[in-house]
């Protein structure tokens, strides 16, 4: 198991508030992802999902926020918040964690398509940032339930869907597909 806490400390070195927010939020995401995984043991038994990797990647998925300008969550960088996924992927690749980097890169929203980047003129490199693997989708899904501004609170499904509608029906449809896969009875 990698020492995700040390990696987060390294990038939050002089920012105790951000470290606390990032660790708390990421732990919530990891715990939900692992709880969902516990309800689907066939994915672990088949080798399709590695629970150790899921915990590590969930803990590191938002490391890119350290480079963003989001004062409400003590992020004092210069980049737009929407960039945190690909920036986190760059950090994790530098740390020698390419598989973890893919999770960071593909967790924003329900994934960001090239069409969305062009339509919304997003300041991120033009490529498809949709989650591909079951592990990537699981962490992307679990992340939607927690905000970095309201630590300790679960977002209700209705609030998640309402927020995602701002990005179009395709975004909501992808979320609904993930819900059907991971928590079909909720």
Task: Tell me what each language-model feature is.
Residues 27, 31, 98, 180-183:
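Generic structural signal for well-ordered, non-transmembrane alpha-helical segments
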Residues 9, 30, 34, 88-93, ...:
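Amphipathic alpha-helical segments within well-ordered protein domains
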Residues 1-81:
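Acidic/His-rich, divalent-metal-binding segments that scaffold phosphate/diphosphate chemistry
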Residues 49-153, 157:
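Divalent metal-dependent catalytic cores for phosphoryl transfer on phosphate-bearing substrates
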Residues 164-186:
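Charged phosphate-binding loop/patch that engages nucleotide di/tri-phosphates or the phosphate backbone
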Residues 3-10, 53, 99, 103, ...:
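Exposed alpha-helical structural elements
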Residues 16, 20-23, 132, 165, ...:
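Charge-dense, low-complexity intrinsically disordered segments
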């Amino acid at each position: 198991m990698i020492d995700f806490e040390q990696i987060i400390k390294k990038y939050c070195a002089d920012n105790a508030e951000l470290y606390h927010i990032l660790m708390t939020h990421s732990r919530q995401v990891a715990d939900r992802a692992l709880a969902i995984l516990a309800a689907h043991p066939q994915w672990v038994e088949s080798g399709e999902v590695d629970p150790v990797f899921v915990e590590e990647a969930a803990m590191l998925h938002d490391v890119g926020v350290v480079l963003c300008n989001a004062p409400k969550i003590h992020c004092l960088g210069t980049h737009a918040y929407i960039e945190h996924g690909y920036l986190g992927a760059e950090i994790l690749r530098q740390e020698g964690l390419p598989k973890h980097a893919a999770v960071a890169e593909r967790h924003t929203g329900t994934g960001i398509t090239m069409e969305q980047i062009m339509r919304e003129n997003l300041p991120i490199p033009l490529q498809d940032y949709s989650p591909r693997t079951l592990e990537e989708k699981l962490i992307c899904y679990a992340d939607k339930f927690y905000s970095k501004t309201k630590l300790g609170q679960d977002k209700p499904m209705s609030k998640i869907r309402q927020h995602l509608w701002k990005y179009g029906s395709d975004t909501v449809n992808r979320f609904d597909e993930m819900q059907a896969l991971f928590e079909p009875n909720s």
